Amino acid sequence: MALWGGRFTQAADQRFKQFNDSLRFDYRLAEQDIVGSVAWSKALVTVGVLTAEEQAQLEEALNVLLEDVRARPQQILESDAEDIHSWVEGKLIDKVGQLGKKLHTGRSRNDQVATDLKLWCKDTVSELLTANRQLQSALVETAQNNQDAVMPGYTHLQRAQPVTFAHWCLAYVEMLARDESRLQDALKRLDVSPLGCGALAGTAYEIDREQLAGWLGFASATRNSLDSVSDRDHVLELLSAAAIGMVHLSRFAEDLIFFNTGEAGFVELSDRVTSGSSLMPQKKNPDALELIRGKCGRVQGALTGMMMTLKGLPLAYNKDMQEDKEGLFDALDTWLDCLHMAALVLDGIQVKRPRCQEAAQQGYANATELADYLVAKGVPFREAHHIVGEAVVEAIRQGKPLEDLPLSELQKFSQVIDEDVYPILSLQSCLDKRAAKGGVSPQQVAQAIAFAQARLG
């Protein structure tokens, strides 16, 4: 059933109808559209459009429809309705007859779809927050179990300084905590209802929009009708949060893909999240992680596309805004799937401590400790930096780690070096000295784990 047509003397071309219709994707707003319609029916009672008995009949029919949709959502796609609003209204009229035609009094699809989408976003943010915190918890648990797994830290993908696998896990906990904060912050701006703003100028009925907002679970009602039907900031905000969150997951995936290579060999992924080759029997490919990394691009594309769609629109509703849903639905679905998959990857990961330790002992990751040792002996840091660089060149020439160079060799570079240098060059000493807040020392890592556990509950 079309919600318009009296103005027209010709039927829509079938090609235009297919081009214009949005039911194939906005069917996902069915539950929100029905819930919003129940609230609107209550508001119509307060202004005398509906009697209490009529409202009760409408609400009962809408609730039956809601249960039917939950049981069989795909039924919606069997219809040729233009959009989800048309479908719900048509089904309602099928159930209650002419009474169903009174429900849209004082309401526009402009404020209706804005309300539906905000309700959907609120529900989806709740799911994302749960999945985000589950992944944080998985990372904290992995950190808890690997506090003694020493491995090389990298800059420029070159071995730099020793860290622990726990410290690496906690870095991603921090990123995910920021993602969580962004979602919680977005909820504050989502929590205002546009219902009752009409097409653009407000409704002609003296509806208490604050009461209406409360019935729908919103904190308040919007303050300007023109802005309310024009606003898609919440779509951009959530796409931006998703884009940033997926960058974090992509980096997480890239790190683990590298750690899982034969060349690094720091971890082994579970068979449950890997696949094989159709040709090479020995292969065990990190497909779950590669897909997380690859899906990052489609989420970035959704954000860019929505920015370009909105940038030139005049105020109030334009049909361009129908393009807000497919990208948003796909981006948030993708982010949610990737959060779940990242947690699954961690569930079966094996950290190969001996190999991590071996790699940490290579690459002169303790060179900074020698420079700090020289500074403690009174050598200016820039000079100490140069001295240690020369010592590293000599160690490389001899094929030895720094700590295996005899004292006589080290003293060729600086006479202040003494026997007390050797304990300082040990990996454990390198870790222990990083005891300032946020550092990699065992004490700091343990405190960070405890803090994260307390925050996550």
Swiss-Prot record:
Belongs to the lyase 1 family. Argininosuccinate lyase subfamily. This is Argininosuccinate lyase. It is found in: Cytoplasm. Pathway: Amino-acid biosynthesis; L-arginine biosynthesis; L-arginine from L-ornithine and carbamoyl phosphate: step 3/3. SUPFAM superfamilies: L-aspartase-like. GO terms for biological process: arginine biosynthetic process via ornithine; L-arginine biosynthetic process. Its EC number is 4.3.2.1. GO terms for molecular function: argininosuccinate lyase activity. It comes from Escherichia coli (strain K12). InterPro entries: Arg_succ_lyase_C, Argininosuccinate_lyase, Fumarase/histidase_N, Fumarate_lyase_CS, Fumarate_lyase_fam, Fumarate_lyase_N, L-Aspartase-like. Pfam families: ASL_C2, Lyase_1. It catalyses: 2-(N(omega)-L-arginino)succinate = fumarate + L-arginine. GO terms for cellular component: cytosol. Keywords: Amino-acid biosynthesis, Arginine biosynthesis, Cytoplasm, Lyase.
